[in-house]
Amino acid sequence: LFRSEIHINRQAAEVLNSDKAISLLPIGITAIEGEFEKDDIVRIIDFEGNTVGVGKANCNSLQAKEAMGKHGKKPVVHYDYLYLE
């Protein structure tokens, strides 16, 4: 169903699982598996390999890989389009 996965670190997982409305930023991404285009639905996987949820990509996989791990970049998944399990 979901061709692509975005893997996130512990800190990103904790923030996403908090009560705050927060977008998935590139700084919290550790790996990207598969390719996706902007607006594709991607699965979000935590540091232990568990599915955290799904979201609509704000960019394509190439742009996400370039921004991965960096500060001050646009969200890869905006919180309005983030569905947590």
State where each predicted segment sits.
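Beta-strand/loop-dominated core regions that host nucleotide or nucleotide-derived cofactor-binding catalytic loops
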Residues: 3-85
